[in-house]
Amino acid sequence: MGYAEKMGTRRAKTLVALIDGLDPEYVERSDMPNLKRMISSGAYTVGKAVLPSVTNVNNASLVTGRFPDQHGIVSNFHFDPRTGRSVMMESAEFLLRPTLFERAGRLGLRSGLVTAKDKIKTLLSRGADIAVSAEMPEPAFVSAAGSRPDMYSAEVNYWVFRAARHLLRRNDVDILYLSTTDYMMHAYAPAEAPSLEHLHRLDRLLGEIVDDHAHLGVLLTADHGMNAKTEGIDVARVLAAKGIAAEVVPIIRDKHVVHHQNLGGACYVYLEEQADTLKASEVLRGFPGIEEIHERAEAARRFRLRKNRIGDFLLLGACHVAFGALPAARQEIRVRSHGSRHEQAVPILCYGLGPDVRRLEYNLDLTRRLYHSRTVSTAKWSEGYRPSSL
């Protein structure tokens, strides 16, 4: 008899799990018997993350069930060309659409968020009845899940899963959003021993959560994949060499520099002079390693980004390329990172809920459908739902 049967669950629960950086190759190569059993008995596909393929953009998309043109989160880092000020995109004031927590509350449901990174809590927990981060845990969760873990370790993700289990077992929430951190994916390729151990232990913790609840619905996905980057490009230096002044923002940029050295596969370019637009476009299009160049209007339309929050250009790199501030315009680097189209593939799993994943193209489609499931029979998550497409 499982924990739920012993304690008397009030109603079925839903776990929305975003495993940061869980490239499908990690799933394929790892010993994860519980997840693979859920894949076999549930509904599974490999779908797409939202571009740019970074943490804030995709967590916001999953929490709101909307693309960035509606929710407003287009980067980890925001530059305002009118003021010249730069800030981390970590405040809820940037989020322009209701969260799943707010929607759940209107239906009389209790919701919670457990995350590794405190920035996810400050950005996305609006409306949650309970919100906790491993980075800055409250005393009650230290006693339940353990002392504050090292953010640059596998332990931080184990802490998140233990805290999630604690909340679900206490019957405090009907729906719980879980978000890990991708330090281990940045540090290790799928076949490396530390990665295999990390995911095997996460799988065991996931299995314990599922075993606790006879009717738990699980929606599991990732915010992006991961690739080895061997060539760095400093776009500001590339343009400056041709007499073009610009502010270049690596979209991956955040305070967790150890993860990725602020080097990622996508960047925004803000020109100092709009008269340089054509010249800059020609320079960038001729530079090896820059795979895609989209001017603001095209980028907003094609990738459903909020036009007034992106640069004059959106650049996407080749698979081996990362953009960022470097000592030279081009140099050899060694970092595992993401942000480009090459890190867009993500796993999409529905377990215990029953939707047809063939209709789910993007990770955010999981929460666009959430209250169409039987988990909360009185709820409708999205009226007139249609699968998203680009």
For each feature predicted by the language model, list its residue ranges:
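Active-site-proximal N-terminal segment of extracellular/periplasmic enzymes that hydrolyze or transfer
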Residues: M1-Y44
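Beta-strand elements within well-structured catalytic alpha/beta cores of enzymes
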Residues: R11-P24, M38, L62, A104, ...
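Glycine-/proline-rich flexible loop or hinge segments
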Residues: L15-G21, S40-V46, V54-N59, N76-M89
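Short, solvent-exposed loop/turn segments at secondary-structure junctions
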Residues: G21-D23, S53, P68, D118-T122, ...
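Short, structured active-site-proximal loop/turn typified by the sulfatase FGly-forming signature C/S-X-P-X-R
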Residues: V27-D69, G112
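Secreted, luminal/periplasmic, and some membrane-associated catalytic domains
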Residues: S30, S53-V54, H78-S91, R97, ...
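His/Asp/Glu-rich, glycine-adjacent segments
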Residues: S61, G65-P190, H259, G265, ...
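Low-complexity, glycine/alanine/valine/leucine- and proline-rich hydrophobic stretches
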Residues: G317-Y371
